[in-house]
């Protein structure tokens, strides 16, 4: 059995660790709420752009933009969103496992995969894994802006425009609630055909006056739409990261508390054994006299 001094040292060490995990839990909770606010604020923008695209596509069906046109998949691309830091449970691992399964399915069809990485964890993992990485963006912080993503996303959009990639997907963690984060793989390009389907409300073919031309507006709006979806995925992944970290740090704090209780019990037993031994020695010495 360890001595009382050693056990006291362990108790002090675990208590210090518990203070750190509790502080990290509170910081993660605060950052999660801020990320949720950004996540909710970005949704109306994406929804409004989607409506504009839908209207433009229906009112000008003679213009077949490449982003709205489906073609045979000879090569696919994935924009992968992960965290820059760890200590967030199995958040990244679950996403990577889902991705590897999907990538394996494409590989079995003889379709190569190209990757665009957002986040240090995905960058490290897929460089070890041996994936073909076309672009990357890391260390964006807890409050990224759309401008931080434009250059990285443009690489994949150019690849799609030039025919080097025939499908483009976004892989990120979807925020369900504080306790649940779900890996999600969402198709970005070609944009869902439902966007171009005829709507009964637009049968009368009313339209806006565009400056510049509707074709140029659609070209720009489609790019902004994809950028907004990627940004939405990034801020949602940050909310997932902070929620997972908060839960992980709470579990660590609780485990530290249980460990401290066990160590305290061991210390009490060691102290009791030492007192009993001293009493036995005193009694033995008195009997010898």
Curated annotation (Swiss-Prot):
GO biological process, one term: proton motive force-driven plasma membrane ATP synthesis
Short name of one Pfam family: ATP-synt
SUPFAM superfamilies, A to Z: ATP synthase (F1-ATPase), gamma subunit (SSF52943)
GO cellular component annotations of the record: plasma membrane; proton-transporting ATP synthase complex
Localisation per UniProt entry: Cell inner membrane
Membrane topology annotation: Peripheral membrane protein
Superkingdom to which the source organism belongs: Bacteria
GO molecular function, one term: proton-transporting ATP synthase activity, rotational mechanism
PROSITE patterns in alphabetical order: ATPASE_GAMMA
Keywords: ATP synthesis, Cell inner membrane, Cell membrane, CF(1), Hydrogen ion transport, Ion transport, Membrane, Transport
Main subcellular location: membrane
Function: Produces ATP from ADP in the presence of a proton gradient across the membrane. The gamma chain is believed to be important in regulating ATPase activity and the flow of protons through the CF(0) complex.
Family: Belongs to the ATPase gamma chain family.
Subunit structure, interactors included: F-type ATPases have 2 components, CF(1) - the catalytic core - and CF(0) - the membrane proton channel. CF(1) has five subunits: alpha(3), beta(3), gamma(1), delta(1), epsilon(1). CF(0) has three main subunits: a, b and c.
The protein, known as: ATP synthase gamma chain
Organism, as annotated: Nitrosococcus oceani (strain ATCC 19707 / BCRC 17464 / JCM 30415 / NCIMB 11848 / C-107)
Gene giving rise to this polypeptide: atpG
């Amino acid at each position: 059995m360890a001595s009382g001094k050693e056990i006291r040292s362990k108790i002090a060490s675990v208590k210090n660790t518990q203070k750190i995990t509790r502080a990290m839990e509170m910081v993660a909770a605060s950052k999660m709420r801020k990320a949720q606010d950004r996540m909710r604020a970005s949704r109306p923008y994406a929804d409004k752009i989607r409506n504009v695209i839908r209207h433009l596509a229906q009112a000008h069906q003679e213009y077949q933009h490449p982003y709205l046109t489906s073609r045979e998949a000879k090569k696919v691309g994935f924009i992968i969103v992960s965290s820059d830091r760890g200590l967030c449970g199995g958040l990244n691992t679950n996403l990577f496992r889902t991705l590897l399964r999907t990538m394996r399915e494409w590989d079995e069809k003889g379709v190569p995969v190209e990757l665009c990485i957002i986040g240090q964890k995905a960058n490290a993992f897929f460089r070890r894994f041996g994936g073909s990485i076309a672009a990357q963006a890391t260390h964006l912080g807890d409050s990224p802006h759309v401008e931080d993503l434009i250059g990285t996303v443009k690489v994949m959009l150019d690849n799609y425009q030039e025919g080097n990639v025939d499908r483009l997907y976004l892989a990120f963690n979807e925020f369900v609630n504080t306790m649940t984060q779900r890996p999600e793989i969402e198709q970005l390009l070609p944009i869902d055909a439902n966007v171009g389907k005829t709507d009964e409300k637009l049968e009368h073919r009313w339209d806006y006056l565009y400056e510049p031309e509707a074709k140029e507006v659609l070209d720009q709006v489609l790019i902004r739409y994809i950028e907004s979806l990627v940004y939405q995925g990034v801020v949602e992944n940050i909310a997932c990261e902070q929620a997972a970290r908060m839960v992980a740090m709470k579990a660590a704090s609780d485990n530290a508390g249980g460990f401290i209780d066990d160590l305290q019990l061991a210390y009490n037993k060691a102290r009791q054994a030492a007192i009993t031994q001293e009493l036995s020695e005193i009694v033995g010495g008195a009997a010898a006299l």
